[in-house]
C-alpha cells in the first residue's frame, strides 16, 4: 500500500495501529478508543481482531466509551464513574447490575453477544 496515513479511513488507521504494535511481538496491548469514529463494518472487524488476539493469549486493555462493543468482547470489565471504579466483573454481571444500569448503562441497555 502506497498511501500516507492521513488518507486512511478510521478503520484502516485502527487496523494499521494494531499491526504496527504487533510487529514488536507484545504480550499486552492498550487500545485507546478503538471503536470511536469508525463505521459499523470497521467496528466489527476490529472486534474480530481483538477476539483473535485474545485467543493467541495476548492481553488486551481497551478504554472506550462505546460500552456495548467493548463489553461484547471483554472477559473482565471495569466501569468508571466520576473517576472511580464503579463496578467490575464479567460483561453479563455489569449489564445486569442495577447500580451500573442506573448510573452508567441506562435502564434499557441490552448486552448482545456476537459470534465473532
Task: List each language-model region with its residue ranges.
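Helical segment within the ABC ATPase nucleotide-binding domain
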Residues: 44-56
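Hydrophobic anchor residue at the start of the ABC signature
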Residues: 18
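Conserved catalytic motifs of ABC-family nucleotide-binding domains
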Residues: 25
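Conserved ABC ATPase signature
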Residues: 4-8, 12
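ABC ATPase "signature
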Residues: 88-89
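Catalytic Walker B motif of ABC-type/P-loop ATPase nucleotide-binding domains
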Residues: 29-33
Amino acid at each position: 500500500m502506497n498511501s500516507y496515513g492521513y488518507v486512511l479511513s478510521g478503520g484502516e488507521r485502527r487496523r494499521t495501529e494494531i499491526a504496527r504494535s504487533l510487529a514488536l511481538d507484545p504480550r499486552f496491548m492498550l487500545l485507546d478508543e478503538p471503536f470511536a469514529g469508525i463505521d459499523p463494518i470497521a467496528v466489527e472487524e476490529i472486534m474480530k481482531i481483538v477476539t483473535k488476539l485474545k485467543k493467541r493469549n495476548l492481553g488486551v486493555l481497551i478504554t472506550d466509551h462505546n460500552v456495548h462493543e467493548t463489553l461484547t468482547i471483554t472477559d473482565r470489565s471495569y466501569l468508571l464513574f466520576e473517576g472511580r471504579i464503579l463496578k467490575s466483573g464479567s460483561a453479563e454481571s455489569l449489564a445486569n447490575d442495577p447500580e451500573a444500569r442506573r448510573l452508567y448503562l441506562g435502564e434499557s441497555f441490552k448486552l448482545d453477544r456476537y459470534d465473532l
